[in-house]
Design a protein with these regions (language model features):
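Catalytic toxin/effector domains delivered as secreted proteins or via bacterial secretion systems
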Residues: 1-109
Length: 109
């Protein structure tokens, strides 16, 4: 579940971190964390990109922009449970010139 993955990434169950009014899933060792789980259902296996019908791209880009602005230079990592999802986010961020967030493939071990 998404909650289980968030706990895995952040090391804390059910907590969030708010920095300058912007929500992150957590913070560990000075790094702002976001856990992304189960997005592969929105990704076309043939193209590796989000399906056209997936309406969440703009909100994800908005979330990224708000987090970068709120970070005050702190490192931001978005962790992904699925490698396919990581690649789709790399393409999405690159296409919109989103920089300042490290994308990490981090399956539950």
């Amino acid at each position: 579940s998404a909650r289980r993955y968030q706990t895995y990434v952040t090391g804390r169950e059910g907590e969030v971190w708010v920095q300058n009014g912007v929500r992150f899933d957590g913070m560990r060792d000075g790094v702002l964390l976001e856990a992304k789980d189960h997005y592969s259902q929105f990704i076309d296996v043939n193209t590796g990109e989000f399906y056209d019908w997936f309406g969440g791209q703009s909100s994800l880009l908005d979330e990224a922009s708000r987090q970068i602005a709120a970070s005050e230079g702190a490192l931001i990592e978005w962790h992904f449970s699925e490698e396919r999802t990581l690649h789709a986010f790399e393409q999405l961020f690159s296409s919109q010139n989103i920089e300042g967030i490290s994308l990490v493939f981090d399956p539950i071990k």
